[in-house]
Amino acid sequence: MSFQQRIQHHPIAWACVIAGLSYSSYSQAACEIQDLQPARDLPAQIAVATQACYNSWFYAPTATLDNLYSEASLAHLQTVLDAEIARYTGEAQQARRLENYGEFIRAAYYVRYNAGREPYSQALSQRFAQSIDRFLRHPHAFDQGREQVGAMKSLSLMVDNVKQLPLTMDAMILALHRFNRETAQDTQWVDGLNNLFRAMSGHVGNSEFYRYLAANTQHIDTLYRFALDNEWALETDAEFLVYNALRETGRLLISPDAITKQKARHVMRQVIARYPLGSKHDKLWLAAVEMLHYYAPEVLQQLGIDLDAAKRDLAARILPNRFECQGPAIIRSQDLSDAQAAQACDVLDKKEQDFHQVANTGLAPVADDYNTRVEVVVFANNSSYVNYSSFLFGNTTDNGGQYLEGNPADQNNQARFVAYRYANDADLSILNLEHEYTHYLDARFNQYGSFSDNLAHGHIVWWLEGFAEYMHYKQGYQAAVKLISQGKLSLSDVFATTYSNDTNRIYRWGYLAVRFMLEKHPQDVESLLALSRTGQFDQWAQSVKLLGERYNTEFSAWLDTLQRDNPDNPDNPDNPDNPDNPDNPEQPNPEPNAVTQLAANSSLTLTGKAYSEHLFYVDVPEYSREFHVQISGEGDADLYMSYQQVAHYYDYQVTEFTYGSNEQITFKPEQNGYIKPGRYYLSVTGRADYSAVILNTHLVTEQPNEQPTIKDDLAPVLLEAGNSQSLTVHRQRYVAIYVPKGVSEVQVWLTASEQNRGNVDLFAAKAYWPTREQFEHASTGAGSHEYLRIPVTQEGYVHFSLNAQQLGDTVEMVAYFD
């Protein structure tokens, strides 16, 4: 979930930061997606782009697939990319061009995937992979430097976009030999190496990848040796590289090739023996056990590992603190004191009271909901969250926390949300605490049934996420209001949002739609909630469509009003940059120690005397990949920074000061690859007089190449004969069933949900994981009702693939033996 802090503006502070400060902004190259449309020489325009334009490339409208992102356009760009690689000598300007080309190409693949279009041709994707391979074998490919690393990261990450890892894996494996104690200091560079493991994870179920590995099983030996040789890295910020090497080796257990599986099983056994639970690096044990549990559970039985007991022991050790609130929350934490837990209870209690008033619930839960208590699980930091949460609770961890509703109709169900702290000081610092708690309350008092029931007919994501954002921010969500200036969405479009859309549309535009409806049409909200509280989600969707059409014009005008009233709007008389503001133009007595917001990816020019101090802060949202602050100029200025507290030259957390005014502070990502979200304060202080010192902030927020918030769990589900299994399929799911001796036939039924809104096809094979292209048995009728009869002659697994080319569905799957 996105995390922003409310920004308070002071007119004087914004009029003039301190005496002696001059401000200038640097215009960016015309590289937004709309700027590229009329370009006569598209590659040349891309080459000079700035990183600030990347998001617009990834969020480009679908129409760009017919021009900027057409196959012909990308084919031409591939030849340009090849030529740029051929003349690459490691210079920063060249590297910047390579990164720009890489990001544009990746954006094209991302937009095409999300639009549901047919993929680009395999020939084009293979040519891109060959270009990447040429780059990775280039003598300057792994040079260290900000621009050079940017090029390496972008091009190596493209492997997963084009899904051609067999053509580049040799070079990517070879690159691991460059990892050492010196190169490990640059975690961005290390993250570029980690793109091998991102690609391996992204190639699950890819038959070409498994055939390649079957012919190159020496790579499994190389990965295990890499992990053993670099155990020292487990004590550093680069530990994720070793961890992922072993984890992705374990995922190869899914391969249909017997030797590949045998080698992967051997490595997992070795890892379990070397890093037992309770030892210093037991997260490697967890990774191995998790992979075996999904793909080779018989090995766990052979080793005598009791998963339930292991989870209980681990939870007791990692989450030793338990505190019951007066309300429904039970707080289990890694490091919260009782006083802090009580403070969290107070926050949740106030949020619950506010919730019931806003949603007008009458304190009555929906029918058949037994989630009377909710566990609030709080890990000490993101690292612990990533290491342990998935094993203990089964959630994904590439996020800022997650609500796990379970089945509310089950009286033995335990609802919980898992979260982590972004700072370990006296403050609570629990990321998304109020947002996730609102999900619990909304599900219990406003939404009948389970999460999949809520989503069955669509047109509800705007409420689920927008309402949680509204309850957290109320009228103070400036990041959402600022988004309006980038182009308005119609209310109908916002209402149609799905979890496959980008985070801005899901959270910020969802917030705007919810706020509009609550402020302008509360009676309509009451009517909608009456439907959702009784499980009438089909009627909800139909009503929402009509409301969108009815209020589109009014919503657009309301957005204009919000924008005019926004303090950051230059037309607002309260904005200090507005010449009509009475506090501007020439404020003779500026506030000397004002702490002023500094926008990400902006520049200031500073001038000051010795011992003068300029104070700023930068808000870093969740899902930020890169963040650094730099000064350069004449004289002697120093840069000091702190996280979550004002920085001064005499009180700071980090500095890289040296003689002169050329300094840079770079913040390293946490284990999940993201910068810790929150407010970063900085001080520019004169050791001597200085002038023309440029202060620059560089922030790369979540690139939309990441998987959508809601995505398929690609871990195979183990089916038992006679037991029905409910599965939600967005694009692809895997299921396996073990057939014992004496069985001659397996009969399998796939039954759609009552709504039967999608089309899920069923594929089966005995010796490998089937795909739509390669299978032994298939049922591909219209809708999601499928049936297979599979003859068997020996014991072993039968593998199934549930595949939806366009719209997925929730299905019930059951199998019987004859």
Curated annotation (Swiss-Prot):
<comment type="similarity">
    <text>Belongs to the peptidase M9A family.</text>
</comment>
<dbReference type="Pfam" id="PF01752">
    <property type="entry name" value="Peptidase_M9"/>
</dbReference>
<keyword id="KW-0865">Zymogen</keyword>
<keyword id="KW-0964">Secreted</keyword>
<dbReference type="GO" id="GO:0004222">
    <property type="term" value="F:metalloendopeptidase activity"/>
</dbReference>
<keyword id="KW-0645">Protease</keyword>
<feature type="signal peptide">
    <location>
        <begin position="1"/>
        <end position="29"/>
    </location>
</feature>
<feature type="active site">
    <location>
        <position position="436"/>
    </location>
</feature>
<dbReference type="Pfam" id="PF08453">
    <property type="entry name" value="Peptidase_M9_N"/>
</dbReference>
<protein>
    <recommendedName>
        <fullName>Microbial collagenase</fullName>
        <ecNumber>3.4.24.3</ecNumber>
    </recommendedName>
</protein>
<comment type="function">
    <text>Possesses gelatinolytic activity.</text>
</comment>
<keyword id="KW-0378">Hydrolase</keyword>
<dbReference type="InterPro" id="IPR007280">
    <property type="entry name" value="Peptidase_C_arc/bac"/>
</dbReference>
<dbReference type="GO" id="GO:0030574">
    <property type="term" value="P:collagen catabolic process"/>
</dbReference>
<dbReference type="InterPro" id="IPR013661">
    <property type="entry name" value="Peptidase_M9_N_dom"/>
</dbReference>
<dbReference type="InterPro" id="IPR002169">
    <property type="entry name" value="Peptidase_M9A/M9B"/>
</dbReference>
<keyword id="KW-0482">Metalloprotease</keyword>
<dbReference type="GO" id="GO:0008270">
    <property type="term" value="F:zinc ion binding"/>
</dbReference>
<keyword id="KW-0862">Zinc</keyword>
<feature type="region of interest" description="Disordered">
    <location>
        <begin position="562"/>
        <end position="594"/>
    </location>
</feature>
<keyword id="KW-0732">Signal</keyword>
<keyword id="KW-0177">Collagen degradation</keyword>
<dbReference type="Pfam" id="PF04151">
    <property type="entry name" value="PPC"/>
</dbReference>
<dbReference type="GO" id="GO:0006508">
    <property type="term" value="P:proteolysis"/>
</dbReference>
<feature type="binding site">
    <location>
        <position position="439"/>
    </location>
    <ligand>
        <name>Zn(2+)</name>
    </ligand>
</feature>
<feature type="binding site">
    <location>
        <position position="435"/>
    </location>
    <ligand>
        <name>Zn(2+)</name>
    </ligand>
</feature>
<dbReference type="GO" id="GO:0005576">
    <property type="term" value="C:extracellular region"/>
</dbReference>
<keyword id="KW-0479">Metal-binding</keyword>
